[in-house]
Amino acid sequence: MDAAALERDAVQFARLAVQRDHEGRYSGAVFYYKEAAQALIYAEMAGSSLEHIQEKINEYLERVQALHSAVQSKSADPLKSKHQLDLERAHLLVTQAFDEDEKGNVEDAIELYTEAVDLCLKTSYETADKTLQNKLKQLARQALDRAEALSEPLTKPLCKVKATNIKPKPPPTRTHFPLGTNPFQEGPQPFISPQSCDAQGQRYTAEEIEVLRTTSKINGIEYVPFMNIDLRERFAYPMPFCDRCGKLPLSPKQKAMFSKWVRPEDLTNNPTMIYTVSSFSIKQTIVSDCSFVASLAISAAYERRFTKKLITSIIYPQNKDGESEYNPCGKYMVKLHLNGVPRKVIIDDQLPVDHKGELLCSYSNNKSELWVSLIEKAYMKVMGGYDFPGSNSNIDLHALTGWIPERIAMHSDSQTFSKDNSFRMLYQRFHKGDVLITASTGVMTEAEGEKWGLVPTHAYAVLDIREFKGLRFIQLKNPWSHLRWKGRYSENDVKNWTPELQKYLNFDPRTPQKIDNGIFWISWDDLCQYYDVIYLSWNPGLLKESTCIHSTWDAKQGPVKDAYSLANNPQYKLEVQCPQGGAAVWVLLSRHITDKDDFANNREFITMVVYKTDGKKVYYPADPPPYIDGIRINSPHYLTKIKLTTPGTHTFTLVVSQYEKQNTIHYTVRVYSACSFTFSKIPSPYTVSKQINGKWSGQSAGGCGNFQETHKNNPIYQFHIEKSGPLLIELRGPRQYSVGFEVVTVSVVGDPGPHGFQRKSSGDYRCGFCYLELESIPAGIYNIIPSTFLPKQEGPFFLDFNSVIPIKTTQLQ
């Protein structure tokens, strides 16, 4: 953080606060006094040497408290008339016409200029306000003059052309690819051809295009990939824009309080997209999206601390400096990272209010500021409405920023957690700006929540991490903007706070006693005890190399559980060139979600398992043992981190796994690395498949070779291969039985060479599945005997032959 820049922010905010205070605009004054105080808090954290900084902070916060009653009693400024709003819309039409004019899009520019003229003339006839009439007529003249100037070159040549030769302008087509080689990297994105895919220059396959097309439809609405052409989206209209998808469904709590839908100009006479990006001004209401609001808060805090656009860059329209702007026509476009790629979400600006005119959605404490409510609305639209089932910050932050999600469970039997190592990592990475962090509580009783000032299963934004003489602290914000921690180091704790610690943390217990904004300090030990999960979102810029594959796993492929066989699981080869000093490779598995019920009742437990098998296909889950075993969780995102320490080439097999496969899933596997790598699906070398359906029944359930008297009664099949080549044989039987098979040579054609054999087996008998893969089997005739380990184990089985050469099979017994 830049202390000098924060000091300048504080001076600017204080000046605006005092100005509004003197003008009697108390709501604005309250907002800017808070922002000035927060800027000074951050400046002190960054090493500011300003004298009496704490006194100034307290002065601003005391003025906030004093103004609260004045805000309640003061009547609001009059709202703009319809005709004033029409003038603003006309100005936007002309502005967007001028943009198209500059780009040489003559026909689009003429259309926009003409609509501006029509709107200005219509409104000038309707209003009796002479000043407004003059402004409208002046704007109409300017627009008309430019439209006529543009029309002249078009109309002159057309006079010589026969009408039959005139063809209508074709509608624009979406032939461009989503922005950028890596849409998550900062900076301008290069244009990419329609076929391109990723940072490694690969093209999308037909399967990938179909995956992205299929998962574009979310809750019945299509959200297409965000493309270069979308930067030319039209935002100016003569009438207020209405989303053709209709109003968002409300939650039951909203319905109970709902009065009507309003636009920003119905609430304030000076709507603005962003006054200042602040985590402290964001307030959640009755929508159950605490994790989303916490995600907005930490994104805003990041922007303020590091002066890098993160959250405010995703909403359009934007000016030429890339800053989001208020649109009097009411149309907005938000770029969200959904189902594998950045996608385009169109909304209008209608928001729900209660009978008192209070918003029933999240909002900024500065009521004229819109970005919080509009970004929330876009996300709620995708999620099916304000009746949001709830989420977690990994999902929300990935959608908002594209940053890499990671989950740390502090009380999990399957995941180890080190308090000391975790704190050191979080402290270092947080202050470098590498990571965004939230913390969530788990299930607790109402009495426990009341005792400790915590909300059960609730997400809190992490705003700061500090350490002082061996004591470790986390600063949290409750998205509700009220209700704080009541344990150690709360504002009411008279035992543990020392003057020295208060100075270091810039904390005066008297200040929060005056105003509850939901922000508090908690010790790291208490957070680890009373909270359940820490959600991290990593800056993808840390790992410059990235590529992805989009794919589908059909529910019909393989068994429901992959506890015994991975033969039908999607598998990938990852080859990494590790430099001196080591490297990190992260693999993010993201399941695409297209249905609200799926999101609310996520029953798909996914994971990624890593094997060191030189990129070869893995058939048995535990043979060889996994290099990194995955934990199956019902979150759409799963991150695997591979740490490399020795230089050279490292080759891995990555296996997508589910706990119980019930449904077909679409997913994206994205690899991030600081060093070069290649990543691809493991292809099947086989082009010919043949399946035999058989069963062990009665006498034919003879068991393995240990049972000589009955083993000879097992089914026997014969297969004939005309040419030498590779062969894969798989046997699937009931999971409760251990199964295996033998292959016996009957005859071969010519000299079998080194690949000849008399007898081969599938190895140890295994539950439900076994296989034998031969690099080359000589041309000839062979018998195969499938069996269970014990006699009298009856049931069906499947024998699958996979080769590049046609196979003839017959049953001998």
Swiss-Prot record:
Its EC number is 3.4.22.-. GO terms for biological process: proteolysis. The modification Phosphothreonine is found at T95. GO terms for molecular function: calcium-dependent cysteine-type endopeptidase activity; cysteine-type endopeptidase activity. It comes from the Eukaryota. Residues 702-813 are annotated as: Domain N. One of its GO terms (cellular component) is nucleus. Keywords: Acetylation, Hydrolase, Nucleus, Phosphoprotein, Protease, Repeat, Thiol protease. The active site is at C290, H458, N478. The modification N-acetylmethionine is found at M1. It is found in: Nucleus. InterPro entries: Calpain_cysteine_protease, Calpain_domain_III, Calpain_III, Calpain_III_sf, MIT_dom, MIT_dom_sf, PalB/RIM13_Calpain-like, Papain-like_cys_pep_sf. Residues 232-540 form the Calpain catalytic domain. It is an enzyme of class 3 (hydrolase). Residues 541-701 are annotated as: Domain III. Calcium-regulated non-lysosomal thiol-protease. Belongs to the peptidase C2 family. This is Calpain-7. It comes from Sus scrofa (Pig).
